[in-house]
């Protein structure tokens, strides 16, 4: 049973949370693509006799005359399985007109393939789900800025920024002159530009409100005629070329008045008209003379304190580019390339034989779209750890990417929270680290309007009464500045009258107070200003913002558990977050369930149509190796309504988000095991699979065509015993259901090897006996170090089955291995309030502290983690969860509950605890009096004695995060070295070593551990000769020789020499007569004038030594050094 703890005003259900992705892509299909095609139509050849028109009979709103999309070859599921892209072919009606003969050819032409969006707002590219992140960029338009020069005089500048094309910047200087820069080039007088545009003095003066200011500029530079001004313009922009009037004219035309080269965009025109009070038509996307005069007029007015300068971080000046627009820009790039190709073909080919199909080559457009989806910074591998991660990824706003900022150049101002973010961009959810503030998340109720500006909804307030009956009004940041807006948690009575005497309001970006009668608008919900992830944190208002940020980010890293468990204390948004994430199955119609199995649900609709079959995902692997599994919630015969959840997905229970588990926590220190945020847990969490999750890993191998012949997937692997092959079938592929450990063969593969690959002894044997040993080497796919599990699926791809394989591959085999991971020491768990920690010890149940009724606690947290971090929300949650458990209910609390009275959270929790105590009759549950209010007596499990002080105990919601110790633990004995520095590589994937850095070296220096330090910097790292000899010495039990010169020192010497610095190394020798002289040492020559570094030589036992003829005694034969050097194997030590 779920109970709303506080009778909150029914929060309006949130809008569709993935709308931003879907709407944008639909706009691209409906308008964006056609808009681009029409902007390139017609394409005329250089002589002007051939014309190619796209969409010749296009009429807005009539789809029959537009382009056509064919049915995709695969559906999304099939595309994923085949590693294909979910895309459709596009055909465009074209018309080729031959002006000489008057001949007209109409044809539908294939122009390329477009990846389609799935109904969850994602794209499937080469079998992987990807998301296009929304980009937030500076809006085109005009921006005014003021600066103080070094003499303290204020100067103003205006930048005219188009969507694409040249920037135009006007500036005033200390002498009161107006200058202009075109594309950041040299300064040019504004008078010259205006004269070059063909304006007379009187026209210029008439259009300015303060012509006297411009007079100085005209007197100094305004004596040019139009021709002279054009010559002067050409001289400034193209210095070094002979100026001509026509050249200047053409330069000006192409820079600002040619729609191909200059485009303000719809937004730019809208912003320009709004800022300068113009009424130029919206379809005029290039600059006009009126625009330029108005910009100069506004600039001059600023000198007279009329108008105001702009704040570039205000959300009225930043807009969102979603999928549709990013894709449209990419299509433009492709069509630009296509246009060049078409023109060339028109010129080269015979005009009689030309058809539109022979002119249009789909390759450039396909390449541009592929490049965007495959390698753009904004096309990201979807974060599928859990439903919330997926949802947040689709709502992310990034200031990075093409046309945006870069991490290095972004200052503090851009990253900072701006008052206009309120209700539009979440002030809390952003990454920690270099991207802080550059990547944000859309607020819960925000939406993006047709121009790309973020809007937030409000209710009107008239004479202090909230008019919900009038519906919601969406305002952009610009519009909102003019009104007094109250937050969503102002107290109102039943009639909607605001009851407070003074209300906090936002007005012109200031946070002030106002009388209810002065308020214009009120927000629709208290969670309007935060994002979805943040709004899932209960008692958010009691947490410090830094910790709330960690809490929001860590919920996205929670691993879906085996047995999902909804939180006892939630915020009421869990159901919608789960539904909109696309991981649960939602009914499309009302009807009756006729059939339910683990794999599918069949619903018979009420309108009598065909039964609808909902297929469920079973144990699929997600992008993050977690397990996607859907479980039915309905039974045959149940009635369902549209929007009802039919099946749970990963990390959901009963259609609500369930990222973690409700566990019994006690806040107390325990033998130092929870020092520094470490966490002590009970063995019960392991045995009862409370924090157990399923992970599915994918391993892949391809059999390629090599120069020496094809690689073969087979069971016949050289030098491998039958025991290692026990799990393989007759083709050498592991069977489904086999349990495999690290090093086991998954797929047997042999590669042909040439003459050079064979060691000398094998060559010798073949020379003597002439026998043809199988010249193949083992190249099988094995389970990597530290991995294990059960094989759950094997997929084989071959060309014969019609699969598309990478070039050079004959066959691809993919093996999926699943593993149940129980919680263990080293795993990271966290609450929703930024309280995270690593498990330090798992105690037996009998040793855990226990309560008065004998219940052992599950988790022991350190109480010192609360005061300094200021995330007190966790204490409220833990105590309310304690009450919820005893009352048998779940609570839903909207954050920001002060509208229900002062200290509403504390009073609510206290009231519920009292209720639980009275209802259950257990007095020890809650101690209402004195300084121990809310704490209870806890007993030591080892001794049975009560602890000295009462302890805070309750039910908290804890998440297991994806940072699992199994994926991180790593050790290296011998492994690969870097080619240049010869130092060990780093990282688990490269089988790397641990970096002994600068500071660690200082620590050993300070301690005086000279020999350990020398070993670390030479033998254990990059002294090639030394490390081989050390290995030999260890194998033979001899003393380790002295270290030599590190390779990185030689690299340093070589780099200095490459800068023409004569650097060499000398050593001092003492002659027999006591004289000293220094001798140059050649570091590059090898110790014993050998060219190759020595390899380790082992004492090895040969088969002859073991033969009975030798008397069965062991003699040790040693392979010679020369033989060693002949082995051209990779130096893997």
Swiss-Prot record:
An example GO BP is:
DNA-templated transcription
Protein name as catalogued? DNA-directed RNA polymerase subunit beta
Which HAMAP family is this protein grouped with? RNApol_bact_RpoB
UniProt feature, compositional bias: Polar residues: 1090-1105
Task: Relate the protein's function as given in its record.
Answer: DNA-dependent RNA polymerase catalyzes the transcription of DNA into RNA using the four ribonucleoside triphosphates as substrates.
Which family would the database say this protein is a member of?
Answer: Belongs to the RNA polymerase beta chain family.
Q: Which UniProt keywords apply?
A: DNA-directed RNA polymerase, Nucleotidyltransferase, Transcription, Transferase
Q: Which gene encodes it?
A: rpoB
